[in-house]
């Protein structure tokens, strides 16, 4: 189920404050955040936001195509590890 339109998008207050400060100052320094559940809003376009994935900070450059998505979508938390390839075939 999606979020109600009347509530509006969720964005952490500290992240929103930092984005507004960066836009006002004109600096393009990466903003670090743990808030993976925050929605990307149009005010963030052009900024780089470093999202924590539990181990490292993943830099995400915000473009117009990313508006409406969540920050956590672009910082994967799980690493894919495939099974070892066993070439032990009987009869060769």
UniProtKB/Swiss-Prot annotation:
Domain of life the protein comes from: Bacteria
Q: Which Gene3D superfamilies match?
A: 30s Ribosomal Protein S19, Chain A
Gene Ontology molecular function terms on file: rRNA binding; structural constituent of ribosome
Q: Which SUPFAM superfamilies does the UniProt record give?
A: Ribosomal protein S19
One Pfam assignment: Ribosomal_S19
The record's annotation in HAMAP family points to: Ribosomal_uS19
Q: Name one GO cellular component term.
A: cytoplasm
Q: Which UniProt keywords apply?
A: Ribonucleoprotein, Ribosomal protein, RNA-binding, rRNA-binding
| Species annotation | Treponema denticola (strain ATCC 35405 / DSM 14222 / CIP 103919 / JCM 8153 / KCTC 15104)
Q: Which InterPro entries match?
A: Ribosomal_uS19 (IPR002222), Ribosomal_uS19_bac-type (IPR005732), Ribosomal_uS19_CS (IPR020934), Ribosomal_uS19_SF (IPR023575)
Functionally, this protein is described as follows: Protein S19 forms a complex with S13 that binds strongly to the 16S ribosomal RNA.
Question: Which protein, by its recorded name, is this?
Answer: Small ribosomal subunit protein uS19
Q: Name one GO biological process term.
A: ribosomal small subunit assembly
Note the PANTHER family from the entry.
RIBOSOMAL PROTEIN S19P FAMILY MEMBER, SMALL RIBOSOMAL SUBUNIT PROTEIN US19M
Family (UniProt): Belongs to the universal ribosomal protein uS19 family.
């Amino acid at each position: 189920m999606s979020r109600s339109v009347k509530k509006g998008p969720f964005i952490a207050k500290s992240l929103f404050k930092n984005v507004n400060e960066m836009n006002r100052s004109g600096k393009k320094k990466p903003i670090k955040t743990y808030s993976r559940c925050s929605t990307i809003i149009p005010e963030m376009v052009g900024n780089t936001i470093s999202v924590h994935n539990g181990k490292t900070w993943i830099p995400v450059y915000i473009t117009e195509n990313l508006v409406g998505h969540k920050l956590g979508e672009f910082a994967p938390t799980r690493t894919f590890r495939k099974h070892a390839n066993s070439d032990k075939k009987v009869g060769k």
